[in-house]
C-alpha cells in the first residue's frame, strides 16, 4: 500500500468510535497497546505482532499490505460508512462482525489465487477455496469449486457453489476435504 494512503487510514481510524487499527506489514502486524479484548482478537488472526507507541512508525519501517480495523461491540457493519471515501486506490470490505479490511483495489485473495493458478497451469475449474466472510468474495469468485462455511455471511453463501454442512468451528473444511 502507498505509505500516504496508510497514514490517511490511521488518521481516519483514530476518529471512528470503537475502532482500533491493525497495520499489517510484511514483517509483522502492528497495534498500539491493546486492551484484553483487542489483544485476544489480534492474537487470533496474526501470528507475528508488534506493539508500537505510534502506528505511523510501522509505516516507515515495513511494507504495509493492508490495514485491518477491529471494532468493539461488533460495530463493523454499521461503521462501514466512515470508510466510504477512504481513498481512490483502496477498497474496504467487511471481514467479520468486528472487522473491516482496507487494502489496494488491485490486490486481494482472488488475484493471488489467479496468479498461483497461472504460474502452475491450474485451470479455474480445478481450483478450490473456502471462505466465511465478505473479504473472501474475490477468493471464491476465482475458483471453480467454491465453498462458504455454514456459519458464513449470507451474501457469501449466495455466491459460493457449495455451503459446508459444518461451521469453521466444527472443522467444516476438513469434513469437505475428507469426502473428496
Can you name each region flagged by the protein language model?
Residues 1-7:
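Glycine/small-residue-rich loop that forms an oxyanion/phosphate-binding "nest" at active or ligand-binding sites
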Residues 8, 12-130, 136-137:
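Conserved acidic, metal-coordinating active-site core of Asp-based
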Residues 101-180:
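Mg2+-dependent phosphoryl-transfer enzymes with acidic/Ser/Thr/Gly-rich catalytic loops
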Residues 1, 71, 165:
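Catalytic cores of large soluble enzymes that bind and process phosphate-bearing ligands
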Residues 4, 60-61, 178:
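Intrinsic-disorder/low-complexity regions
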